[in-house]
Amino acid sequence: MLRRFSLFSLGFLGWLLVSGNASASFSSTLSEGYHTLSNNVAQTWNEPEHYDLYVPAITWHARFAYDKEKTDKYNERPWGAGFGVSRWDEKGNWHGLYLMAFKDSFNKWEPIGGYGWEKTWRPLTDQNFHLGLGYTLGVTARDNWNYIPIPVILPLASIGYGPATFQMTYIPGTYNNGNVYFAWARFQF
């Protein structure tokens, strides 16, 4: 019995030590991530290479996730515009700060602003062609939620040539809510 208790105690103590190290490691990872993010946002704001025009192009409600009666009523032409600043870092990745307003699914104005980052690849010998995958962190507000600010973390993907980029995201959701593909053109000046 004493032997089992000793083995259990040693195992529990080892678990506490490992979980303490994992917790410290997780905390330091979060801290490093926050510092990297805040430094990238500050550098993009203070040292922009480009001014960007955003032109919303399409919203598409995933038909498998909606009743037809709902999608028949939704607006899928998000008229609007936006403005931003951006830069390419030393690794060739894209960073941007943006503010955009567009007509949402109910044809009401929806503003969104935030920071976007994309890992960028240039797979062809023509370095003007680029592909990107990343994320955006921002805040939006919707009419059907009384324009209460709502934080968003969404994936980003893009395909572009030179200063013109077609950028997109997917808003996940539940049945008859969310599950929207949203895309826009971004022009760098």
From Swiss-Prot:
Family in the record: Belongs to the lipid A palmitoyltransferase family.
Protein name: Lipid A acyltransferase PagP
A GO cellular component annotation in the UniProt record: cell outer membrane
GO molecular function list: acyltransferase activity
Keywords assigned: Acyltransferase, Cell outer membrane, Membrane, Signal, Transferase
Signal peptide coordinates: 1-24
GO biological process: lipid A biosynthetic process
Role according to the record: Transfers a fatty acid residue from the sn-1 position of a phospholipid to the N-linked hydroxyfatty acid chain on the proximal unit of lipid A or its precursors.
Classification via NCBIfam families: PRK11045.1 (NF008271)
Cited Pfam families: PagP (PF07017)
UniProt subcellular location: Cell outer membrane
Lineage: Bacteria, Pseudomonadati, Pseudomonadota, Gammaproteobacteria, Enterobacterales
Record keyword Acyltransferase present: yes
Subunit structure: Homodimer.
Enzyme Commission number: 2.3.1.251
Annotated organism of origin: Klebsiella pneumoniae subsp. pneumoniae (strain ATCC 700721 / MGH 78578)
UniProt site (Role in lipopolysaccharide recognition): K70
The keyword Signal is annotated on this UniProt entry: yes
Reaction(s) the record says it catalyses: a lipid A + a 1,2-diacyl-sn-glycero-3-phosphocholine = a hepta-acyl lipid A + a 2-acyl-sn-glycero-3-phosphocholine; a lipid IVA + a 1,2-diacyl-sn-glycero-3-phosphocholine = a lipid IVB + a 2-acyl-sn-glycero-3-phosphocholine; a lipid IIA + a 1,2-diacyl-sn-glycero-3-phosphocholine = a lipid IIB + a 2-acyl-sn-glycero-3-phosphocholine
Top enzyme category: transferase
HAMAP family: PagP_transferase (MF_00837)
Catalytic residues identified in the record: H61, D104, S105
Residues carrying the site annotation Role in the phospholipid gating: Y175
Superkingdom of source: Bacteria
